[in-house]
């Protein structure tokens, strides 16, 4: 019992060390559509308060945005605009929760929500957490998520989200 308690405490300390509470930084995004092979490059500014407010405003292409304010998700991307209530749209609810959990360092919950297993690797001063769905991916869920943190300060530097439909978004966080 004592050994299990020590392992659990060590795991919780590891999660806390790599939990990023807030962001106010620039980012780049590479979107790859596996079916068509089309690649799109984007860039912008990301602000995350550590809870349930995320704002991604794009400078390339200018005018695009992705915003989470509580349960509201506002999107203006790729010529499509939408204001969605995540509580009413299950697919949006899962995507919202996964993004917020990954940004806040709560990757274990993201794995549970996406019916996934996790693995952790550390090399060259970076810690990479891979989250890979097992079996059927929940509607709106991610087939895989890869999070890369700097070991020195626990800051998230890269996030790769692969949707079940074959779209891969790679975010490099400055």
Tell where the protein language model's regions lie, with residue ranges.
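N-terminal signal peptide c-region/cleavage motif recognized by signal peptidases
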Residues: 14-16
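Polybasic/polar functional segments that serve as interface/processing modules
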Residues: 21-35, 39-47, 59-60, 74, ...
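Gly/Pro-enriched, hydrophobic low-complexity segments
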Residues: 120-174
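An acidic-aromatic
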Residues: 46-98, 169
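Positively charged n-region of N-terminal signal peptides that target proteins for export
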Residues: 1-4
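Sec-dependent N-terminal signal peptides
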Residues: 6-10
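Short, surface-exposed coil-to-beta transition loops
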Residues: 40-43, 61-62, 69, 140-145, ...
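Flexible, processing/modification-adjacent segments and terminal tails
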Residues: 20-32, 38-39, 78-135
